[in-house]
């Protein structure tokens, strides 16, 4: 039996991945170890798509983004995070510390990002940490 037109959801402009929060990767496991044939759970991908989409709508409410562009931006964010984490890890090792603090993150951002971009990133990061600290008290 065909679904009625009233039962359908209206189409949205947001990409399918943008409506979901970053998802955790689940190793595909069977739900029952016995002989029952159960479907494996689908491995979930963690992405920054929903956050990128929210920022895009704050800056340009009438602009959309293609899945390919979203994938490129997601790769960019992952790459920058990996570079910052690697540099912060090296800084902690140089100083014979086993913990990465906000100071190592800040220094690694200054080393990785050029000039004015580093200054803005550090100020935004400081603002975010201050906001978080005040909200948890």
From Swiss-Prot:
There is a cross-link at residue 131 (Glycyl lysine isopeptide (Lys-Gly) (interchain with G-Cter in ubiquitin)). The keyword Acetylation applies. GO terms for molecular function: DNA binding; protein heterodimerization activity; structural constituent of chromatin. It holds the Pfam family Histone. PROSITE patterns: HISTONE_H2B. Keywords: Acetylation, Chromosome, DNA-binding, Isopeptide bond, Nucleosome core, Nucleus, Phosphoprotein, Ubl conjugation. Residues 1-10 have a biased composition (Basic and acidic residues). Monoubiquitinated by the UBC2-BRE1 complex to form H2BK123ub1. H2BK123ub1 gives a specific tag for epigenetic transcriptional activation and is also prerequisite for H3K4me and H3K79me formation. H2BK123ub1 also modulates the formation of double-strand breaks during meiosis and is a prerequisite for DNA-damage checkpoint activation. It is found in: Nucleus; Chromosome. There is a cross-link at residues 8-9, 24-25 (Glycyl lysine isopeptide (Lys-Gly) (interchain with G-Cter in SUMO)). Residues 1-45 are annotated as: Disordered. The modification N6-acetyllysine is found at residues 8-9, 13, 24. PANTHER family: HISTONE H2B. The nucleosome is a histone octamer containing two molecules each of H2A, H2B, H3 and H4 assembled in one H3-H4 heterotetramer and two H2A-H2B heterodimers. The octamer wraps approximately 147 bp of DNA. Core component of nucleosome. Nucleosomes wrap and compact DNA into chromatin, limiting DNA accessibility to the cellular machineries which require DNA as a template. Histones thereby play a central role in transcription regulation, DNA repair, DNA replication and chromosomal stability. DNA accessibility is regulated via a complex set of post-translational modifications of histones, also called histone code, and nucleosome remodeling. Belongs to the histone H2B family. This is Histone H2B.
